[in-house]
Amino acid sequence: MPRLVLSLFAYLFCSTLLQAQAWQPFGVRQLGFTFDVPPGFVLTQHEDQGAAFQGPRNAFLAVWGARLGKASFRAEIEHRMMEDEKAGWQLSYRRVTPKWASYSGVKNGEIRYVRAIKVCNDRAALFTINYSRFEKTPYDPIVVRMVRSLKAEGC
């Protein structure tokens, strides 16, 4: 019995370690940001400014950089929130600061979480993830790690 418990512990420890290492770095150097893509997400589209990934059970992740132009960071985020509301997303959380912003909402049984950071003066880096609201609990730590991984780099 002790061997079984020890074997199970070793398996779980190694599985957790492998899963932690399965995050893939992604970045757009010319736009000045890096980001970690969670395990299980497969690249479906890649362009100069960002990429889209398909995740388990139809989860969708997009990460990209944007030049702000004449718009301020706050104005850009408020515009995105307004567009999402027009598209039917019921926003339940909003936080906009001078250097970062987050908001989330629900629509048709899905959760959308958006995170943006200001990078390199006139640019922003953003990610959006959509997933089933029935998977909120397992996605919470994934979203937290993605938020922490979105960083300015190479300005």
Language-model features, listed with the residues they occupy:
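C-terminal partner/receptor-binding element of secreted or periplasmic proteins
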Residues: 137-149, 155
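Short, solvent-exposed mixed-charge patches
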Residues: 21, 154-155
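Positively charged n-region of N-terminal signal peptides that target proteins for export
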Residues: 1-4
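N-terminal "mature-domain start" segment
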Residues: 21-44
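General secretory precursor processing signal
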Residues: 17-18, 123
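Bacterial N-terminal signal peptides
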Residues: 7-16
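Conserved polar/disulfide-associated segments of primarily extracytoplasmic proteins
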Residues: 43-141
